[in-house]
């Protein structure tokens, strides 16, 4: 099965949804759209709380493409301009209620409603939020016809208050009458009159009209709403905080982004933020998150208020706060995140899945490792995963990989739940899940079923990858970390056409991802004959990654000290080379080459001009050795001596440096009989640096971020690098952080002894 997975043939890519699967599109008036959900904005990335299940019949996958309905009966009276007519006559069907739901399924959820659950938890929210469940006395059809007749007869004689009253009354029509009303030319005339009289509206009039528009489902794209937003902007400084939040909430219900209003609202908040109540604060953070628009200065002020109210906030509100900050791409301080983690841990069993995922998102964004939260998540998540939508599962999985947190129970639950519902995944979900498993270097018990289902889904999602090309390299790298190589998909990803598409259609620079994939295929798939990156792009990727790695390593004093000590021990910079043996693996190495007699070779020509090779001699380095250190070197003290014993025991005196014989550490054995302390490399000649090395060592200077959290298990990228180095004949020597970092506090001699043991013991 594994062999089959690694040689999957690329299917002919077809759109997931066919016209027959979708059903016949109906002619819809451009008013007749339930845009009050979240139309006009990007599909939300969060998940909903999935207590019940629903099964969808005869609907297209909304993940592959967003359906467009073109109207055929737009009212001329509502076309204030040709531009608005053309814009408003094309409607996006992205509301969950636009799909037909017959049975229950965990993948069908009303995310808009579930994000707003917190608004039902305190009576204070009713003052400054819109409640769609509010009912009013229904208006009869005959009464509505009478109102519309008056509009036609009196037109410009109607007063502003009468226009507002008519709009509010008409919104009380039964829902099934709304489409008829929106097709009415008299209603279109009433809307035009409202625009003409809008300067006479006060704040409450504006709020009432916006409520009517929400109930009737006025399209978010109509130019009439531009005029209403402008009026709201003019009214900001005359509104109370509750009114401002209510207006922002109504615009959210209309599905319209209101950047001008929010800019002025932010100015207002900078003066009045200290007066925010708890409910106003949480609601404001929700509004900010949904509009993705905020100043960092204001968010810092709001963070201080979160601390003020932290003991009064309930768990759903915690989830709302996290989601708002996450969507606005604003970080919370580690202190606040630890407070949030403590709140969640205190009652995690009662934390809704929606709030849990939102908190997880923020922990991933801030990269705060709350240990107790991680532990409790590992206990509760496996139970929740079967009832989560795949987007929620993706966020949990991505959290684990971002924090390097490998919990086998969580990962196994994810792997077990996905194959049967993989069709619900977006391309983004497939990519992030594969990346997470690959990053954590973990294969679940059902690995073959898990990976085959996701690889097959990649094939089915190819039209979507054309739209979001950044997700395909992510998929393939996650698979490569786990040693899966679907060659037809790789061939497509490295094709000139896809590379060009990736450069044109995404804001991300995918060269390093494609370069990593290209280099990996070159080593691990020797029989691969498909597309490869051009020489130019390979060079670009190599230079880009080397610049990053060199800058990173040269900024670390501990690495520079290690490099200097190795050069000292081996005899000079010509014996050690700091470079990227495998540039596509994104990290650098310290390479050392030994001859058949296990003596270092001066192979680094960048450090030693060729004409000077014949004059190379190992210089006296003046290393003083204690008796203890000599015993370690000459008697082969076990390397475990340096692991976990780098600090002096209580009451034990540190090693004292006395007048001992000074010898270099350049060879495998130290010649202590040489009283001058100098040792030459016998027979060194110009050809010495050209001889074939008996052994090539790739010294890895590691840190804790290359391992799973709290363990010594390498992450996927670094495990793949070791695998590829071995394929190329290198022997990996690891300077692990748990061994080397404590030694940095010890004497220079102890460091040299440790490095000597590492280099030459590994060669045996």
Swiss-Prot record:
Pfam families: FAST_1 (PF06743), FAST_2 (PF08368), RAP (PF08373). GO terms for molecular function: rRNA binding. The keyword Repeat does not apply. InterPro entries: FAST_2, FAST_kinase, FAST_Leu-rich, RAP. Residues 697-757 form the RAP domain. It is found in: Mitochondrion matrix, Mitochondrion nucleoid. GO terms for biological process: mitochondrial RNA processing; mRNA processing; regulation of mitochondrial mRNA stability. Belongs to the FAST kinase family. Found in a complex with GRSF1, DDX28, DHX30 and FASTKD2. Associates with the 12S mitochondrial rRNA (12S mt-rRNA). This is FAST kinase domain-containing protein 5, mitochondrial.
């Amino acid at each position: 099965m594994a062999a089959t997975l690694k040689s999957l043939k690329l299917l002919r890519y077809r759109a997931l949804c066919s016209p027959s699967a979708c059903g016949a599109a109906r002619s819809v008036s451009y008013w007749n759209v339930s845009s009050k959900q979240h139309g006009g904005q990007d599909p939300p990335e969060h998940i909903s709380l999935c207590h019940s299940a629903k099964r969808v019949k005869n609907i297209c996958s909304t993940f592959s493409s967003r359906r467009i309905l073109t109207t055929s009966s737009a009212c001329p009276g509502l076309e204030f301009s040709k531009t608005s007519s053309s814009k408003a006559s094309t409607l996006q069907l992205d509301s969950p209620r636009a799909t037909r739901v017959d049975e229950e399924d965990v993948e069908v959820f009303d995310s808009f409603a579930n994000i707003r659950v917190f608004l039902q938890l305190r009576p204070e929210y009713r003052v400054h939020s819109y409640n769609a469940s509010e009912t009013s006395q229904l208006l009869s059809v005959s009464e509505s016809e009478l109102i519309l007749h008056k509009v036609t007869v009196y037109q410009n004689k109607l007063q502003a208050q009468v226009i507002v009253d008519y709009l509010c009354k008409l919104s009380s029509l039964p829902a099934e009458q709304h489409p008829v009303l929106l097709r009415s030319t008299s209603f279109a005339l009433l809307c035009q009159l409202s625009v003409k009289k809008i300067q006479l509206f006060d704040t409450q009039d504006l709020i009432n009209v916006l409520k009517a528009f929400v109930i009737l489902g006025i399209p978010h794209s109509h130019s009439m709403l531009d005029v209403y937003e402008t009026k709201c902007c003019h009214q900001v400084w005359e509104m109370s905080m509750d009114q401002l939040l209510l207006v922002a909430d109504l615009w959210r219900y209309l599905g319209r982004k209101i950047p001008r209003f929010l800019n002025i609202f932010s100015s207002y908040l900078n003066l009045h933020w200290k007066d925010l109540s708890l409910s106003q604060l949480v609601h404001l953070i929700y509004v900010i998150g949904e509009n993705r628009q905020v100043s960092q200065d204001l968010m810092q002020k709001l963070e201080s208020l979160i601390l003020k109210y932290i003991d009064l906030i309930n768990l759903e509100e915690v989830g709302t706060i996290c989601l708002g900050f996450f969507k606005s791409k604003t970080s919370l301080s580690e202190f606040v995140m630890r407070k949030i983690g403590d709140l969640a841990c205190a009652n995690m069993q009662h934390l809704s899945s929606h709030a849990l995922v939102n908190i997880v998102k923020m922990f991933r964004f801030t990269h705060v490792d709350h240990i107790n939260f991680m532990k409790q998540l590992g206990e509760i998540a496996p139970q929740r995963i079967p009832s989560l939508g795949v987007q929620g599962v993706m966020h949990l999985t991505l959290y684990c990989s971002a924090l390097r947190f490998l919990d086998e129970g969580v990962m196994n639950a994810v792997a077990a739940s996905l194959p049967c519902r993989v069709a619900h995944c977006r391309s983004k979900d497939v990519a992030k899940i594969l990346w997470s498993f690959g990053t954590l270097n973990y294969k679940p018990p059902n690995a073959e079923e898990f990976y085959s289902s996701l690889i097959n889904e990649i094939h089915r999602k190819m039209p979507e990858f054309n739209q979001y090309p950044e997700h395909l390299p992510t998929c393939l790298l996650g698979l490569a970390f786990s040693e899966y190589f679907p060659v037809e998909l790789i061939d497509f990803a490295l094709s000139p056409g896809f590379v060009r598409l990736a450069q044109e259609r995404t804001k991300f620079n995918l060269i390093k991802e494609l370069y990593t994939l290209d280099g990996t295929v070159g080593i691990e798939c020797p029989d691969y004959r498909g597309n490869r990156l051009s020489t130019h792009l390979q060079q670009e990727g190599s230079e880009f990654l080397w610049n990053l790695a060199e800058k990173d390593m040269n900024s670390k004093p501990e690495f520079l000290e290690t490099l200097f000590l190795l050069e000292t021990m081996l005899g000079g910079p010509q014996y050690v080379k700091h470079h990227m043996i495998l540039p596509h693996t994104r990290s650098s190495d310290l390479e050392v080459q030994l001859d058949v007699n296990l003596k270092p070779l001066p192979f680094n020509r960048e450090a030693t001009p060729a004409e000077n090779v014949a004059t190379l001699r190992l210089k006296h380095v003046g290393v003083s050795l204690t008796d203890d250190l000599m015993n370690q070197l000459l008697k082969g003290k076990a390397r475990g001596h340096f692991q976990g014993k780098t600090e002096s025991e209580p009451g034990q005196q540190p090693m004292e440096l006395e007048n001992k014989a000074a010898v270099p550490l350049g060879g495998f054995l130290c010649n202590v009989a040489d009283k001058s302390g100098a040792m030459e490399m016998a027979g060194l000649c110009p050809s010495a640096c050209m001889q074939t090395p008996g052994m090539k060592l790739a010294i890895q200077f590691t840190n804790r971020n290359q391992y799973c959290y709290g363990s010594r298990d390498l992450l996927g990228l670094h495990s793949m690098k070791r695998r590829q180095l071995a394929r190329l004949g290198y022997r990996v020597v690891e300077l692990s952080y748990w061994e080397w970092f404590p030694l940095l506090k010890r004497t220079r001699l102890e460091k040299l002894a440790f490095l000597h043991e590492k280099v030459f013991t590994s060669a045996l």
